[in-house]
Amino acid sequence: MSQAKTDYYSEEKTFSAPSANSQQGTQLPSKVYNKGLKDLEDNDIEGLLSSLSIDELEDLNNDFDPDNSMLPPSQRCRDQTDKEPTGPYKRDNLLKFLEDKAKTEKDWEDVCPYTPGQKRGKVYDSDSGRNSEEPENGKMEMPIEIDLDDDEEELECALVTAPEKDLVDLAGILGMHNVLNQPQYYNALKGKTQDESTGTTFNGIMQSYVPRIVPDEPDNDTDVESCINRLREDDTDLKEVNINNMKRVSKERIRSLIEAACNSKHIEKFSLANTAISDSEARGLIELIETSPSLRVLNVESNFLTPELLARLLRSTLVTQSIVEFKADNQRQSVLGNQVEMDMMMAIEENESLLRVGISFASMEARHRVSEALERNYERVRLRRLGKDPNV
């Protein structure tokens, strides 16, 4: 049988390579077949590859691995954009070019030209196909008999002889929670065995357990009078004042506390949550925010402040820009209003120190822009920590 010319292993597909036994400095080409590739050294193969051009290397790579299955589909297509760009990318010009090309390009020729009124293909008729296959009496000629009750007797015997503990697990797996208590049901779902604590029968009594006693939180025992005196004296050790949940403190004492806090240059946290203060007592906080360079956290949640006063408090933080956390949620008037929300949003965007704001905005735009402003402030803090200029 003669060898075909297109055979891959024919003599025409051999290539020349320097012999491994030839002397150094001489290059005597010799034909190497597939069986002789094992005798070649790595240096000879590297020399052959280095002499190939880029196009030849690409063809060789396609022959060895036309479609690398180890790569994801998005990386299998090789770069075919070798042509240099003629100019900057302009989307409008590209769309106009594609539109003009689509209008001027000739449509594909149809093998069967369109003729009005002519139907192509077979029209589907569900009734005709069904009537042709089904008999007149509506039954199949050779019905298939399926017996689903072959193992009914064995199943009954297994259920009768099964212990009640296994029946409890089976009821839990089948979701029959009405005949089980909660520990039995959840143990069956998790695959845990029933024990004496949960009960192994349907009528078993579950053992009681002593509930864990959680002690109540102690009352706030802050001495308001002592805080007022220490704030007036500008005590360097007093950096936090917390009178949360102290509704029995009189309004006059709260006003005096806020006025005394304005004299302190070392206070960092001031909490007045759930103290039933209104706008008349909280107006002094505006002066406190504008004059205190050390104040970092202000908490006035769960009070009776109006949205207008909250907007003024946020606007006053722009004077020193030292407030890091501002909490004012859960007020009597839950709806702030669109105009007030926009005012608060702009104040937060202008502030470069706020990191946490506890206010519920109803507007989607306000929530989105406030979130972006706080992210920018966090980025400034990160750049300062790395020793970079946040304004660059």
Swiss-Prot record:
Gene3D superfamilies, per database record: Ribonuclease Inhibitor
A biological process term (GO) from this entry: myofibril assembly
Entry superkingdom: Eukaryota
Region (Disordered): 1-30, 59-90, 118-138
Subcellular location: Cytoplasm, Cytoskeleton
Residue ranges, compositional bias (Polar residues): 16-29
A GO MF label: actin filament binding
GO CC field: cytoplasm; cytoskeleton; myofibril; striated muscle thin filament; terminal web
Keyword Cytoplasm applies: yes
Record flagged with keyword Metal-binding: no
Residue spans of biased composition, Basic and acidic residues class: 76-90, 122-138
Primary site of residence: cytoplasm
Record's keyword terms, sorted: Actin-binding, Cytoplasm, Cytoskeleton
Family recorded in the similarity comment: Belongs to the tropomodulin family.
Function: Acts as the pointed end capping protein which maintains the length and dynamics of the actin filament. Blocks the elongation and depolymerization of the actin filaments at the pointed end.
Full protein name: Tropomodulin
Taxonomic path: Eukaryota, Metazoa, Ecdysozoa, Nematoda, Chromadorea
